[in-house]
UniProtKB/Swiss-Prot annotation:
<keyword id="KW-0378">Hydrolase</keyword>
<dbReference type="InterPro" id="IPR026898">
    <property type="entry name" value="PrsW"/>
</dbReference>
<comment type="similarity">
    <text>Belongs to the protease PrsW family.</text>
</comment>
<feature type="topological domain" description="Cytoplasmic">
    <location>
        <begin position="122"/>
        <end position="129"/>
    </location>
</feature>
<keyword id="KW-1003">Cell membrane</keyword>
<dbReference type="InterPro" id="IPR023596">
    <property type="entry name" value="Peptidase_PrsW_arch/bac"/>
</dbReference>
<feature type="transmembrane region" description="Helical">
    <location>
        <begin position="100"/>
        <end position="121"/>
    </location>
</feature>
<feature type="transmembrane region" description="Helical">
    <location>
        <begin position="130"/>
        <end position="151"/>
    </location>
</feature>
<dbReference type="GO" id="GO:0006508">
    <property type="term" value="P:proteolysis"/>
</dbReference>
<keyword id="KW-1133">Transmembrane helix</keyword>
<keyword id="KW-0812">Transmembrane</keyword>
<dbReference type="GO" id="GO:0008233">
    <property type="term" value="F:peptidase activity"/>
</dbReference>
<feature type="topological domain" description="Cytoplasmic">
    <location>
        <begin position="24"/>
        <end position="30"/>
    </location>
</feature>
<dbReference type="GO" id="GO:0005886">
    <property type="term" value="C:plasma membrane"/>
</dbReference>
<feature type="transmembrane region" description="Helical">
    <location>
        <begin position="31"/>
        <end position="53"/>
    </location>
</feature>
<comment type="function">
    <text>Involved in the degradation of specific anti-sigma factors. Responsible for Site-1 cleavage of the RsiW anti-sigma factor. This results, after two other proteolytic steps catalyzed by the RasP and ClpXP proteases, in the release of SigW and the transcription activation of the genes under the control of the sigma-W factor.</text>
</comment>
<feature type="topological domain" description="Cytoplasmic">
    <location>
        <begin position="203"/>
        <end position="225"/>
    </location>
</feature>
Amino acid sequence: MFSLISAGVAPGVALLSYFYLKDEYEAEPLSFVLRMFLFGVLLVFPIMFIQYVLAAEGIVASPAAEAFLSAALLEEFVKWFVVYFFVYDHDEFDEPYDGIVYSASVSLGFATLENILYLLANGVETAIARALLPVSSHALFSVIMGFYFGKAKFAVKKRRYYLWASFLLPFFLHGVYDWLLLAKERWGYYMGLFMLALWWAALRKVKQAKGYARPQAVPPVKSQA
């Protein structure tokens, strides 16, 4: 049991550590990061219940509906909601890269408990595949989300546009990911290409977010009198 739970926890903790340590200006308070991680953990059960109801009522009768409605829309919106209402206006969100750290915290909390439950049901032999696909995909969706949260927080213009992008892009990518899994026809080939493109895009966003200048307060103008 210990080895199974360890296998379930390790990918999420490793990915969160990676994104956390990439913050080169000022590391975020670990207590706040862990709080957001636990928020993500707590999201699993209500989301699973809603997904069960959607399936039982026949609302998600097709692979596309299951991928984009039951999985992508529900999961990404709830994670977006948590980051927006608990992090976006927080004093600790003081540089663009912080959006990635906190979005990853919520998403990887969710992905970690989901991963543990899956391994308990299907065995530890699925751990590597789970780490490479579901856990890492949640992390990569969160990088896109967090990047645009950072843009929205500190942009002078287009803040509403970036906020919409912080939800719509992860939602779309998550929907495509689940649809490829459910399509089954040559899914391994297309999924490999999709994940490579997703990793490339996410790491590029990490680099871009790190490169943005940290916002500085404008010094007051001294009186000439």
